[in-house]
């Protein structure tokens, strides 16, 4: 009892004289914009790795960037979430064929009569103004970081041929070289059809053998039938004798996502809570995982050709004068490459991402890896021990390689010795055989020469 009273007395004195700092550890706010799957604005991922500074005992020798286009309008198409589908739904909201009950107190859709849509079907697929700024700024930052490698007179910039990707690559070039961009660059447009073969930067379009497989549609339908009914039930009372469909919910998510991309604000996002956004984010993860990622056999095949080309460039560092490599592409090409490089080993075709419930801890989160303007940068260093080491940056964060040992610090610094990296079981099939596998298993078109990525 004496000790208890002594402790309480001591505590009272401490509390009376203490200058308390506000405890903020539990004050984190949910930022829904970072959970809009691949339609999220650019942001860093959550796997906070080591510092991205160059190691003090190493010298940068090569850098390879695989860069997604900037923020854009919806893709063309009539389906829900596509440009025409969203535009038609917007018109139905405005003309009353999707009848909002404005008599309901606190109706979150009460703004619709004075709302002016910014999503237009005529702008389908086009890069947004913010997308141009994003890529310009990224090009500027890339040049500032790696300027010592820019020792050539011109640089080949490979880009998937779709206009928004080409525009992104051009704005990136302006960020690096300013008005002299055309004096320093050679833009090489890579076809987005099957003729590109293993050089494709939209490899899902260059693999005829995969065309008959559709694992994505049943996966998405299954998940939508889990998470959308509660949303429909919650929102239905705000409409007059109208029951929302899954397509309606998808279009509401689409308006929210693309208004954020086009103007960084959307009243429609207020219809959803944090759980809704996490469930929508998971839908995006299922789409990538079952479409071209780690839940299907095609994921590592689609990404293997780039992985093999990258590995060839890394291996030839001592005989190669080229030090900077550029490839501009889509989100749907970056995820397969990262799959082939062994980033997402927790799910496989034998253990796919579940469609009846959400796995919060899965590794492949599209919001983190491929937001608008997302990128995968591969750095090659030579260190004081004369060995070469590989490191990946995902959207300005070091990806925590854990399958191939350590860097020269002998700690978890995100670096691996070059041949330990290339020969690791999680990626050796891609780094050694990716092009051959793509050619054979995809029944791909032959190419005259392999592009150096």
Swiss-Prot record:
PROSITE patterns: HIS_ACID_PHOSPHAT_1, HIS_ACID_PHOSPHAT_2. Residues 1-18 form the signal peptide. Transmembrane segments: none annotated. It catalyses: a phosphate monoester + H2O = an alcohol + phosphate. The keyword Secreted applies. Glycans are attached at residues 95, 151, 183, 193, 243, 319, 410, 429, 443. It is found in: Secreted, Cell wall. Gene3D superfamilies: Phosphoglycerate mutase-like. Belongs to the histidine acid phosphatase family. The active site is at 69 (nucleophile), 331 (proton donor). GO terms for biological process: cellular response to phosphate starvation; organophosphate catabolic process. GO terms for molecular function: acid phosphatase activity. The gene is pho1. Keywords: Cell wall, Glycoprotein, Hydrolase, Secreted, Signal. One of its GO terms (cellular component) is cytoplasm. Its EC number is 3.1.3.2. Induction: Repressed by phosphate and weakly by thiamine. It comes from the Eukaryota. This is Acid phosphatase. The keyword Signal applies. It is an enzyme of class 3 (hydrolase). Its main location: secreted. Disulfide bonds: none annotated. Pfam families: His_Phos_2.
């Amino acid at each position: 009892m004496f000790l208890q009273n002594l402790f309480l007395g001591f505590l009272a004195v401490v509390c009376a004289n203490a200058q308390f700092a506000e405890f903020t550890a539990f004050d984190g706010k949910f930022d829904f914009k970072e959970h809009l799957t691949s339609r999220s604005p650019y942001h860093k991922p959550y796997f906070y790795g080591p510092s991205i500074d160059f190691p003090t005992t190493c010298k940068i020798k090569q850098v390879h960037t695989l860069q997604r286009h900037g923020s854009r309008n919806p893709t063309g198409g009539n389906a829900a979430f596509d440009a025409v589908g969203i535009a038609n739904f917007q018109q139905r909201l405005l003309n009353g064929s999707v009848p909002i009950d404005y008599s309901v107190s606190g109706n979150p859709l009460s703004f619709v009569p004075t709302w002016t849509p910014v999503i237009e079907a005529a702008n389908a697929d086009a890069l947004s103004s913010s997308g141009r700024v994003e890529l310009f700024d990224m090009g500027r930052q890339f040049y500032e970081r790696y300027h010592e490698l820019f020792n050539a007179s011109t640089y080949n910039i490979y880009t998937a041929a779709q206009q928004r990707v080409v525009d992104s690559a051009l704005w990136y070039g302006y960020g690096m070289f300013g008005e002299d961009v055309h004096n320093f660059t050679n833009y090489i447009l890579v076809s987005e059809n099957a003729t590109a073969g293993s050089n494709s930067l939209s490899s899902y379009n260059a693999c005829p053998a995969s065309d008959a497989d559709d694992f994505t549609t049943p996966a998405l339908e299954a998940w939508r039938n889990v998470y959308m009914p509660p949303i429909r039930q919650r929102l239905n009372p705000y409409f007059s004798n109208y029951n929302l469909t899954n397509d309606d919910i998808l279009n509401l998510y689409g308006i929210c996502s693309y208004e954020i991309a086009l103007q960084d604000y959307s009243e429609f996002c207020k219809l959803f809570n944090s759980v809704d956004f996490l469930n929508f984010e998971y839908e995006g993860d299922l789409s990538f995982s079952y479409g071209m990622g780690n839940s299907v056999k095609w994921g590592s095949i689609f990404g293997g050709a780039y992985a093999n080309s990258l590995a060839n460039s890394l291996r030839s560092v001592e005989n190669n004068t080229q030090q900077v490599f550029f490839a501009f592409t889509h989100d749907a090409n970056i995820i397969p490459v990262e799959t082939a490089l062994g980033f997402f080993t927790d799910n496989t075709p034998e253990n796919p991402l579940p469609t009846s419930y959400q796995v919060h801890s899965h590794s492949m989160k599209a919001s983190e890896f491929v937001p608008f303007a997302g990128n995968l940068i591969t750095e090659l260093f030579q260190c004081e021990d004369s060995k070469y080491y590989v490191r990946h940056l995902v959207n300005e964060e070091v990806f925590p390689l854990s399958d191939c040992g350590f860097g020269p610090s002998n700690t978890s610094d995100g670096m691996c010795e070059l041949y330990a990296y290339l020969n690791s079981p999680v990626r050796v099939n891609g780094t050694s055989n990716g092009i051959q596998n793509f050619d054979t298993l995809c029944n791909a078109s032959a190419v005259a020469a392999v592009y150096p990525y």
